């Protein structure tokens, strides 16, 4: 079973930095309302692969980050 573990999360200057066990996912904020506009840079073939794996593991990263408490 493939396990993606988030080692640490930094939130500095409206930017989010995730370090995964297998690869890196950079979310750079481009505007002040960073929850709506993000640029994704990833060192994998397809970002959908990571999203689907996380979703299968029960971790909906989008809802967890941006829609918590709504």
Swiss-Prot record:
This protein's UniProt keywords: Plastid
Domain of life: Eukaryota
Cell compartments where the protein resides: Plastid
Recorded GO CC terms: plastid
Keyword Plastid (UniProt): yes
Protein name per its UniProtKB record: Uncharacterized 8.7 kDa protein in rpl22-rpl23 intergenic region
